[in-house]
Amino acid sequence: MAESVLTHLVHQLHLDNQFEIDSAATSREEIGNPPHYGTKNKLYEENIPLVPHRARQMTRDDYLYFDYLIGMDSANIRNMTRIVGGTDSQDKIYKMLSFAGYEDTQKFTGARDVADPWYTGNFDETYEDVVAGCKGFLYYLQQKGDISKEIEIPQ
């Protein structure tokens, strides 16, 4: 869901050429699987195109290649840190909801986990969390000067 939401926001802002967005699993349970039907349905309901993909395992090379690695929950963060060798030496690993509200506070929050629809069945809540995190991430990049401050990020 997060890959599709962030891709959609970036496209709306005409920033496609400034981003490479990908997603990867931090555990092996879903390797090779497409997005869950609940995710597909929620994205369709919100008129957000699904980025077609099948789950792949995150690797240490991802850490070396990408500028940011964003996990949805504490377990993701632990797994990501383990995969990259036990330490986030380049300060690239973040929890999605640490960005939520960044536009108001200009600082990271003590973020809770994104609501996991695997347990809750509530794709609406997950979607709201993901949108808040993605928008906050874009505000963060804007404050850092990585994207223009003149670009208006949708509320």
Where are these regions (language model features)?
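Short secondary-structure boundary segments
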Residues: 1, 73-74
